[in-house]
């Protein structure tokens, strides 16, 4: 019966609510509302998660979110923004019975780099084995204001771990709904969901992300460019059962 509430906190670079490095985080019955994270002009990297940010290196980090709500959280960067509410890299991510509404990942109006990008309006996951069940993603958005920037995954951004993590990863989404999410910009991909399997040309190695959707509904999602509902690329597989567009 533990309850956790973050309301209108502010921070820089990583997660105004919870920031964790090389460890595991469990959130149960949490409420994260109107948290904001931004960086400064000329910053090196970008913004990674506004409510929760978990960074791993050896695959041991685990993020578990259950029966929680993330509303109106916002990340803004002059370089790149990943995860308007939640970010994790390398490890495992489990999200069950949770709601993500009106979260935003965007670049600054006048970004430092002309290729500044925004990924995952609600959630951004790099190099993670992922399970999402019984969850709702509504009215989340990503937007890149850079001339050559990308806007990827209005609600959810999934990517394999070319910079670490296992070579073969799975992402399972079950009994969930994506409604009214959007990506905006000159290169906008995946109004609700973006998933990519990477290739390391120097090592000639593929990093595979296999995506499995079961009883998932996509409706009213939009993209300025490609994939109004979802955009999937790379060597990984895509399996769909009882998916509604």
What are these regions (language model features)?
Residues 83, 190, 227-228:
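The feature encodes a structural signal of leucine-rich repeats
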